[in-house]
């Protein structure tokens, strides 16, 4: 589902004129959204740089690199916070060089799930969904899908899970 949010944030940036081909898409990630950014960047002709903890899986890093993304590894003991802080530092240093979707604070993230994921779940369950359970990271998937399902049926119950370790993703 992370490709939906990445696509929505990138298309929003293009529509607003904030993302142009002279800028690099940069964001913090623990992996999945980063893979989506890298794939979309390759398909649309944008450079991509991704800040992620050094303990992210090699498979994820390899996929990002295969799509041409620059990987900026951060201290694994700082978890996703370290990647987020490094990304913000790099953007502050050279804002003119970067398009920073900021998946943690971008309404296009949760809207992608409100408009897409929730509707798909609703239709695929033939309107019989009663509960929605999701893990949280940026909370975009959980917030958007929960809001969307509750918009379709206020009786739907939403439950979120949170990793018990800072080493998630």
How should these model regions be labeled?
Residues 1-169:
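PLP-dependent amino-acid enzyme catalytic core
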